[in-house]
From Swiss-Prot:
InterPro entries: DNA-dir_RNA_pol_bsu_ext_1_sf, DNA-dir_RNA_pol_bsu_external_1, DNA-dir_RNA_pol_su2, DNA-dir_RNAP_su2_dom, DNA-dir_RNAP_su2_hyb_sf, RNA_pol_bsu_bac, RNA_pol_bsu_CS, RNA_pol_bsu_protrusion. This is DNA-directed RNA polymerase subunit beta. It comes from Acinetobacter baumannii (strain AYE). GO terms for biological process: DNA-templated transcription. Its EC number is 2.7.7.6. Belongs to the RNA polymerase beta chain family. Signal peptide: none annotated. SUPFAM superfamilies: beta and beta-prime subunits of DNA dependent RNA-polymerase. It comes from the Bacteria. The gene is rpoB.
Length: 1362
């Protein structure tokens, strides 16, 4: 196998036994693909499919005027270039978006002839569309945001029942619901009396037959649609019916049934069974004589006209009187409906009988009354309303997904229509659709068919970014359409153009609202690369059109069998959102309809193939799926007699020939975060959930450290998260420094006529959304060869292209003087000294100068009543220097605000007018460092309103940026020149000259001659070979173009910097100061492992006091052994043992290197590690001796191991590895107390565990207050750190003081420390004077209470006891 640049340097030993059939897919594809499909930006307008933006325009246009004389048609849209790039947008606080222009055609027709009179085409600006960055995020108002995908109920038809909860009798009531993509919902439901009702949009219910009548059906037709008929013959005073024996099965015989000879087949009172049916068929019975009583309560199927003209209506219940009328009326034959009590209920007929509407008009009026209560119905209004509800493509759309689900559920064939027309027809309901739904509902009530499971993933679909943006865009366009329709009638008379007609504001507003404030547009979680990826792969059931936390029951939140391989059963938040917010599984993807699919290998006749097929939950029904670890021989045949499989949502065992599919990978079930937990299979599910959630909260440490025990997914996550710099093309590293990498591209990957140079600029010390530090570090060296896709620089929390969220710590499971009580963690001071768990946090502090009523605020160093010392860190403009170390209370930006004018005497006014003295009427409103913060200023940005003069600092910053940019461009051009020179020398070497430059005609061009010349001279040489001359010309042209392009880039940058910034109204200047704060680990910080084993640091001990082993090696962390058994997360113990083996092997390699062993010995030892302990085999022979030495050097800190989820290392393998590292197979070590040197009673489990520092730091939570702000009404201190509030001394705390009898303490708590306004002012004054006397007064809350009682109309007064 070929190793990549980083893999060669550090191979991770993999314990996986199962073959890799397919690699994990690109993890952000659900976001990136969805938005790319929505925009279709790369496609030419003619080739755009009818989806996304194109579909939104097509569905609203053409817009016709009310008269039909003018229309607007959509031609095409185009997206421009965004004004600023992503980094500039983040800096400026603007949105990364592209301007959209739409070509619109205005057609004006002649009023009389309707022929086209005039056509005008024009491009119209339609606002800006936010663009997605390459990592699947959006920059909105300068912050990175993610649009979370939504899991909602798929459009279509669903059949359900109430589980007997609605009616007191416990009777199960069935219902059907047609859910469109947009439009009104249509529900059919049974009530306790077995009548069928209909609801439109969940309003008051109507009898279902009202809708059927409104569709234009009469009684007979309705009965015909739902029932079969049974002919009844009247012959010689007795009745006969046509006999279909099968229909009688299950009924009670109400009379003896005899054959033609009179032999009794079924006696009266017996139940007719299958044997009786067969006997009747054998006897050839076709008619059956029935007594009159048998026909009572039966229902007539159609209108029956008697001899005297009287009509017995269809749907009449037969009774003795009716039968007599029929006999007297000379009716020889009539039809009744075939109904029974077993599987042919007379529900629709009963409903029809209860329905009071007589014809279509009355039915329409009934529906109108329900939909528009209180409005007087007219025939036209009722007709229009009903048609618009379900039969108008403007108001109702089932969508292709809905139609597919609808037809599938009703057992019809389904092909998706491609053209606009067929889509519209399929999008609305037909009469047959409504009747089929009602028919299916009745059949389910009759006991045929099943109700649907609404939590099945075949009935829930994913709406991703693209689709949601499209819907929002359509909403905006529909608003535009209304406005345009009004004005189209004037288009002809006023000679308007499309630009005059269309106002794009509603579209821009709809898009802005969606990206800025939708529930699903979220502030990106940017703690570390994993949290970014997880956020983008999140699937939420909440949001517009989804569920709400309060209404969501237990079933929706629960794990469903269809989640397997689609949605992770582990990763979901704890708390009120549990089960409503999920994470996609590693291999899952959404198909074109939005249903989640997961890949399986096909199995044919018991043989597993390498064909991979993606199945959605709908297609999975009926398949038989084997586990990924089923035993297979070398030809791929399943070897077990009975294979463990999943079938119809159950785990069963089946013979191999019945198996249809097999899992692709053991990790298929879980999400990305869960797949990073080694030995997940040994952890309790609740702890695994905490583990996967806490990995997302890990703060990037100063020096990332790869996990010794990983799962093999680390590299995928680091690469796909986009925090690393990845080579676009292969080549050689030409130049490298801390902020730039330059690659000379390989010849075969170059495009004709380019210099073949790729330049990568790195991100240095920028702030993330969570205030952590984003920084990229180079991992390549000058002259290294890299291939496309290799990692060039690590980002935050990545180490050599692998995700590295924490640090490998030497842990011991033992108690230590109560310092690990209740999951507390005891740390060694060594961790602090080595800065293992130190993180950098960057805070952004802003100072805004506004235009106030009294005059403009000013940013200046001239601040009243502030000493020199306080201004020492500010420059002349009043802004802090970069590099200044500041502490709480220091001034960062000096700012003065005009004070209210005081009454001045005429003399003062005169002096003011003459000398312009203004110092007295401004107050200091500078930006200061908040309490509890200290750090270093690493950057300052100044934004000035357009049209205002920039101050010195702003100009200096601008100049520095321009200089740096010019330097970049110069270097870029220099690199291009160098590359071009080398290519020219390569081309000319060995050629013959035709003169030109310093050469003569016929000169042989040697390398020595050429290398002494400058590029300008080289390009003047004219070679004899014309092809080479042509290529030299190409290079010359290319260099000219590059030079012009670079000049243009510089001019553009200069223009951008020179123009003022768009600031919100009333803001003149904004100064942003970035503070870097270094946070070491300290008691009170929260730490965790990857198995849900979290704890708070309780103490940091000197190294010499920590327990140590016989060699004197101290442990880093002491954990409580009692945290393991009850929590059942044994994975952490296995990780500890395996980590110990990994470190032991590293130590052995280091020893070999120190002893300068031969490369051959190193190879042998590495071969033992990688290829003799089981797991995946590594091809070490493909590495050169230098590469082996480099590999060994990188393994000294420990050999990284991968134990994939559900396919990890076995106990025996861990023991073998421990043995190979010369460590006891038990994994336990004798430890000694560092303080006394005494041995502990028994051996202790010691090993290496990967520990994370979580973003719950004590520095952010620690808070103290003496005085501060008070609440307006109660005059009590505010609460919370953000408000600089106090600690609430509540009811129970008061009880405690009462119980102790601490009267004076209690008094000061309830008065001067809380809401006794005068008392607290007095005591403050007293304390300042050094007099600690307290004089409590009346608490303000007493006054509030008296006022409240008065507001109830009870007069209450306080009488002082004077």
């Amino acid at each position: 196998m070929a190793y990549s640049y980083t893999e060669k340097k550090r191979i991770r030993k993999n314990f996986g036994k199962l073959p890799q059939v397919m690699d994990a897919p690109y993890l952000l594809s659900i976001q990136v693909d969805s938005y790319r499909t929505f925009l279709q930006d790369g496609k030419s307008p003619k080739n755009r499919e009818d989806i996304g933006l194109q579909a939104a325009f097509r569905s609203v246009f053409p817009i016709e005027s009310y008269s039909g004389n003018a229309a607007l048609e959509f031609v095409e849209y185009s997206l421009g270039k965004p004004e600023f790039d992503v980094r500039e947008c983040i800096l400026r606080g603007s949105t990364y978006a592209a301007p959209m222009r739409v070509k619109i055609r205005l057609i004006i027709k002649d009023r009389e002839t309707k022929s086209i009179k005039d056509v005008r085409e024009q491009e119209v600006y339609m606002g800006e569309i936010p663009l997605m960055t390459e990592n699947g995020t959006f920059v909105i108002n300068g912050t990175e945001r993610v649009i979370v995908s939504q899991l909602h109920r798929s459009p279509g038809v669903f059949f359900d029942h109430d589980k007997g909860k609605t009616h007191s009798s416990g009777k199960v009531l069935y219902s059907a619901r047609i859910i469109p993509y947009r439009g009104s919902w249509l529900d059919f439901e049974f009530d306790a009396k077995d009548l069928v009702y209909v609801r439109i949009d969940r309003r008051r219910k109507l009898l279902a037959t009202v809708v059927l009548r409104a569709l234009g059906y009469n009684n007979e037709q309705i009965l015909n649609l739902f029932y079969e008929k049974v002919p009844v013959y009247l012959d010689m005073g007795s009745y006969q019916i046509d006999l279909v024996p099968e229909r009688l099965r299950g009924e009670m015989a109400q009379f003896d049934i005899t054959d033609n000879e009179g032999k009794v087949i079924v006696e009266q009172g017996k139940r007719i069974n299958a044997r009786h049916v067969r006997q009747m068929e054998a006897a050839g019975l076709t008619k059956l004589s029935v007594p009159d009583e048998y026909l009572y309560e039966r229902i007539t199927a159609e209108d029956i006209t008697l001899r005297d003209g009287e009509v017995i209506a269809a749907n009449t219940l037969l009774s003795h009187e009716v039968m007599v009328k029929l006999a007297e009326g000379g009716v020889k034959q009539f039809n009744i409906l075939f109904t029974n009590d077993i599987d042919r209920g007379s529900f629709v007929a009963d409903t029809l009988r209860a329905d009071l509407t007589r014809d279509r008009e009355e039915a329409l009026v009934e529906i109108y009354k329900v939909m528009r209560p209180g409005e007087p119905p007219t025939k036209e209004a009722a007709e229009n309303l009903f048609n618009n509800l379900f039969f108008s493509s403007e108001r109702y759309d089932l969508s292709p997904v809905g139609r597919m689900k609808f037809n599938r559920r009703l057992g019809r064939p389904y092909e998706v229509g491609t053209d606009q027309k067929s889509r519209e027809v399929e999008g609305i309901l037909s009469h047959e659709d409504i009747i089929d739904v009602l028919r299916t509902l009745v059949e389910i009530r009759n006991g045929k068919g099943e109700v649907d499971d609404i939590d099945h993933l075949g009935n829930r679909r994913v709406r991703s970014v693209g689709e949601m943006t499209e819907n929002q865009f359509r909403v905006g366009l529909v608003r535009v359409e209304r406005a345009v329709k009004e004005r189209l009638s004037q288009a002809e008379t006023d000679n308007l153009s499309p630009q005059d007609l269309i106002n794009a504001k509603p579209v821009a507003a709809a898009i802005k609202e969606f990206f800025g404030s939708s529930q699903l547009s979220q502030f990106m979680d940017q703690n570390n690369p994993l949290s970014e990826i997880t956020h983008k792969r999140r699937v939420s059931a909440l949001g517009p059109g989804g569920l709400t936390r309060e209404r969501a029951g237990f079933e929706v939140r629960d794990v469903h069998q269809t989640h397997y391989g689609r949605v992770c059963p582990i990763e979901t938040p704890e708390g009120p959102n549990i089960g409503l917010i999920n994470s996609l599984s590693v291999y899952a993807k959404a198909n074109d309809f939005g249903f989640l699919e997961t890949p399986y290998r096909k199995v044919v006749d018991g043989r597993v193939t390498d064909d991979v097929e993606y199945l959605s939950a709908i297609e999975e029904v009926g398949t038989v799926i084997a586990q990924a670890d089923s035993a297979v021989d070398k030809d791929g045949n399943l070897t077990e007699e009975f294979v463990s499989v999943r079938h119809q949502g159950e785990f069963v065992r089946m013979p191999p020939e019945k198996v249809t599919h097999m899992d692709v990978s053991a990790q298929q079930v879980v999400s990305v975060a869960a797949s990073l937990i080694p030995f997940l299979e040994h952890d309790d599910a609740n702890r695994a959930l905490m583990g996967s959630n806490m990995q997302r909260q890990a703060v990037p440490t100063l020096r990332a450290d790869k996990p010794l025990v990983g799962t093999g997914m680390e590299a995928n996550v680091a690469r796909d998260s986009g925090v690393c710099v990845i080579a676009n093309r292969g080549g050689v590293i030409e130049y490298v420094d801390a902020s730039r990498i330059v690659i000379r591209v390989n010849e075969d990957e170059m495009v004709a006529g380019e210099a073949g140079v790729d330049i990568y600029n790195l991100i240095k010390y920028t702030r993330s959304n969570q205030n952590t530090c984003i920084n990229q570090n180079v991992i390549v060296n000058l002259g290294d060869k890299v291939a496309r896709g290799d990692i060039l620089a690590d980002g935050p929390s990545t180490d050599m292209g692998e995700l590295a969220l924490g640090q490998n710590m030497r842990v011991a499971f033992m108690t230590w003087n109560g310092y690990n009580y209740e999951d507390s963690i005891l740390l060694s001071e060594r961790v602090l000294q080595e800065d293992r768990l130190t993180s950098i946090h960057i805070q952004e502090l802003s100072c805004v100068a506004r235009d106030t009523k009294l005059g403009a605020e000013e940013i200046t160093a001239d601040i009243p009543n502030v000493g020199e010392a306080a201004l020492s860190k500010l420059d002349e403009s009043g802004i802090v220097y970069i590099g200044a170390e500041v502490t709480a209370g220091d001034i960062l930006v000096g700012k003065v605000t005009p004070k209210g004018e005081t009454q001045l005497t005429p003399e003062e006014k005169l002096l003011r007018a003459i000398f312009g003295e203004k110092a007295a009427d401004v107050k200091d409103s500078s930006l200061r460092v908040p309490s509890g913060t200290k750090g270093t200023v690493i950057d300052v940005q100044v934004f000035t309103r357009d049209g205002l003069e920039k101050d010195d600092r702003a100009l200096a910053i601008e100049k520095a940026q321009l200089d740096s940019y010019r330097k970049d461009l110069k270097e870029e051009y220099k690199i291009f020149e160098e590359a071009a020179r080398e290519r020219v020398i390569r081309l000319l070497k060995g050629q013959e000259s035709n003169g030109g430059g310093s050469t003569k005609r016929g000169d042989k061009l040697s390398e020595d001659l050429l290398s002494g010349l400058e590029l300008v001279d080289l390009l003047e040489i004219q070679p004899a070979d014309e092809a080479i001359a042509e290529r030299l010309t190409q290079i010359q042209v290319f260099l000219k173009e590059k030079s012009a392009e670079i000049d243009e880039k510089f001019a553009e940058k200069k223009r951008k910097l020179a123009t003022g910034d768009e600031l919100t109204t009333g803001v003149l200047k904004v100064v942003k100061v970035y503070l870097a704060v270094k946070r070491r680990i300290q008691p009170g910080d929260k730490m965790a492992g990857r198995h849900g084993n979290k704890g708070v640091v309780s103490n940091i001990l000197p190294v010499e006091d920590m327990p140590h082993d016989a060699n004197g090696v101290p442990v880093d962390i002491v954990l409580n052994p009692l945290g393991v058994p009850s929590r059942m997360n044994v994975g952490q113990i296995l990780e500890t043992h395996l980590g110990m083996a990994a470190k032991g092997l590293g130590d052995k390699i280091e020893k070999m290197l120190k002893e300068q062993r031969t490369v051959l010995e190193l190879r042998e030892f590495l071969d033992k590690i990688y290829n003799k302990v089981g797991g995946e085999q590594e091809d070490l022979d493909s590495l050169t001796d230098e590469e082996i030495l480099a590999l060994a050097g990188n393994l000294r800190a420990g050999v990284p191991l991968a134990t994939p989820v559900f396919d990890g290392a076995e106990e025996s393998q861990i023991k073998d590895l421990l043995e190979l590292a010369d460590i006891s197979r038990t994994g336990q070590t004798v430890l000694f107390d560092g303080r006394t040197g005494e041995q502990f009673d028994r051996p202790v489990t010691v090993g290496y565990m990967y520990m994370l520092k979580l973003n719950h730091l004590v520095d952010d939570k620690m808070h103290a207050r003496s005085t501060g702000s008070y609440s307006l009404v109660t005059q009590q201190p505010l609460g919370g750190k953000a408000q600089f509030g106090g600690q609430r001394f509540g009811e129970m705390e008061v009880w405690a003081l009462e119980a102790y009898g601490a009267a004076y303490t209690l008094q000061e708590m309830l008065t001067v420390k809380s809401d006794d306004v005068e008392g607290r002012t007095r005591i403050y004054k007293n304390i300042v004077d050094g007099n600690h006397y307290m004089d409590p007064g009346m608490p303000e809350s007493f006054n509030v209470l008296t006022k409240e009682i008065r507001s109830l109309g009870i007069n209450i007064e306080l009488k002082n006891g004077d």
